[in-house]
């Protein structure tokens, strides 16, 4: 098989390993007894696909209703679960309206009902309901700056949680029914609190942490945002629910797909083709252009010295690189930045082939 075709096949295998139609059904609970309701809610770039998997495998005679929010262009025609498209990675009014409707539905559940939450990457912006005193335009302004300053996604989400009525465990706190959150991870470490800003997860971060992040990256925040965070840090506003809070006794967060699962699937493709796969890890972080330079150095050493691995070899990794955006009109994202940096450093070295892509199909402002 030609190198280009092999790279594409490996990536397709990685995507298939996280395909909701294959991984969601095995995790679905039974319908509640005594006629209780099952409400499905979700947010993220995989929300529609996850909801479709639920519909396909839910008993036809059992009640099922719900609402999921996904990125523009990612919606699917569902029959029992409503699907709404909204803004990503910058939140918008449509997302706020949909989230308000979603929260109202969750609050209508009782102890005999059940909530299935479908959580995936991108949920932080799609599940947006600004806290009291915060306007959507304020949230947009802060989000845009955080996304372009080089902050890690974990840091960005700490700020988001403390400007939200639903993230950072607040969705779980608003629900009286048992909750099963099925989560597709897109973050290093696979911690549910960082995936879609953890709507059903305990939040160990604080208002003071959020303020420190804004200061660290010199974010020019609207007055309303600073006022809320400062009030929270002073104890004048309730914190997000923390680990050990009783609200999580009725909530299970279950990570059903991870970056490591996808890397393993990609590695199997190379093994079958007679290429030695080396998984470097699923937690690669740093500026994408700098990571590209490091990978170029490793690659050149292998090509020149056949060490520490003898070619043919495939270096496989995943993670959450960052990009500091200097031109707001720029295009692309971390994958294209990584590849460009890699290509420049390799300087047309022969026998080297590379692919970098996101399993969700989106690289920054562009499709893969």
Where are each of the predicted segments found?
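Short beta-strand segments
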Residues: 41-42, 67-70, 117-121, 147, ...
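Accessory alpha-helical/coil subdomains and C-terminal extensions
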Residues: 180, 202-294, 301
